[in-house]
Regions:
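N-terminal secretory signal peptides
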Residues: 1-22
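Rossmann-like dinucleotide-binding domain that binds NAD(P)(H)
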Residues: 210-276, 319-322, 326
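N-terminal Rossmann-like dinucleotide-binding module
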Residues: 34-110, 204
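N-terminal secretory signal peptides and thylakoid transit peptides that target proteins
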Residues: 15-35
Length: 347
């Protein structure tokens, strides 16, 4: 498919549309953008993509699904996407988290207007796609849904949180290895402004880091799993693995989770519960100090996902994802123990 065009199939007829003149910057500014562009797209369309570049989404209960679809199906000027398209989606999805389940009808219509075929089951989806984005907002469903995908052998990206517990996270990796399916999971904040400079060694050896993000809660998930994971993902992107203990301090306005690494380094995550809500942090290096952030949208993560689908090379390793989840679970245990230090090895 030429990158300068979007081709749709309606019945047996092919329609060709000129590439949309708006940029991805316009897309990110507002989810309402879909109301500006979608009326120009014929109804009942089906997006067409090359064999080997067809992506399916599981879970239309999150804005990530709509954002990813807009980028891949409309932004034809981005050569990094290399013709990969979202061609089918299974809507469910959380059924008992109201803030998620009530979004499904609207997001389903949004992606349908972007040329995505809506299917009634994961099995039906798997017959139509080459790769899978497991986007279901409810981490409790990920293990069950992931196993169904793994049995098909399809390479999979699992959006945050990878699961709602450390036990389920371990089980997901175990099942992926059993069926020899490449997977990775990540928050988009891993690729925020400044992160690449840290990884490239611009400030030398990392001595410590402080990160922050909003901290919203969902009663069905441990506290940090729902939203705090964004800041925790940033922390581990900078610090790497090796955290041995976590201690959590709680106030009405904010929370502080302090991690001690095996080499003596200290990393902290600050969860913002009031005041200005944002994402960022500071990395402390041997030769410099670097500000992390601001958040720069979903596309940097999507670039990594497409590269992963093309090459099988994981941008985030299993050990780091497991430790991120262990850190968050240890923070929950610390809360239960009234702020006591919790060793990750004891989980």
């Amino acid at each position: 498919m030429p990158l300068k065009d979007i081709r749709f199939v309606i019945g047996q007829k092919k329609y060709k549309m000129n590439a949309n003149p708006f940029t991805r910057r316009d897309f990110i500014k507002s989810m309402a953008f879909s109301g500006m562009i979608l009326p120009f797209i014929p109804k009942n369309i089906k997006i067409q993509s090359e064999m080997g570049k067809r992506i399916g989404i599981i879970g239309l209960d999150t804005s990530h699904s709509v954002a990813f679809t807009k980028s891949l199906n409309l932004d034809t000027q981005n050569t990094v996407f290399d013709g990969f398209k979202i061609v089918a989606a299974y809507p469910h999805g959380s059924r008992d988290i109201l803030s998620s389940s009530e979004r499904i009808p609207g997001y389903t219509e949004d992606v349908r207007k972007l040329g995505v075929e809506i299917v009634g089951s994961i099995q039906e989806l798997l017959k139509k796609v080459d790769f899978v984005l497991l986007e279901t907002n409810d981490g409790r469903l990920h293990l069950e849904q992931a196993i169904e995908v793994f049995k098909s052998g399809k390479t999979t990206f699992i959006d945050k949180p990878i699961a709602a517990s450390l036990a389920d996270t371990k089980a997901i990796f175990r099942e992926a290895e059993k069926y020899q399916v490449p997977i990775f999971s990540s928050s988009s904040l891993r690729f925020a402004t400044g992160m690449s400079a840290v990884k490239e060694g611009k400030i030398g050896q990392i001595l410590g880091a402080d990160t922050y993000s909003p901290m919203k809660f969902e009663k069905t998930h441990p506290d940090l799993f729902w939203y705090g994971i964004h800041g925790v993902e940033m922390l581990f992107t900078v610090m790497g693995t090796g955290c041995i203990s976590v201690q959590r301090t709680i106030s009405e306005q904010e929370e502080l989770c302090t991690g001690i690494w095996k080499d003596g380094r200290i990393g902290t995550f600050r969860g913002l519960k009031s005041g200005k809500q944002d994402y960022g942090g500071t990395a402390f290096g041997k030769t410099g100090i670097l500000t992390l952030g601001p958040y720069n949208g979903y596309d940097p993560l999507l670039h990594q996902i497409i590269h992963f689908f093309k090459t099988g090379i994981k941008p985030v390793q299993k050990a780091e994802t497991l430790e991120i989840v262990a850190f968050m679970e240890a923070a929950d245990v610390s809360k239960q123990k009234k702020g006591a230090m919790v060793k990750i090895s004891n989980l």
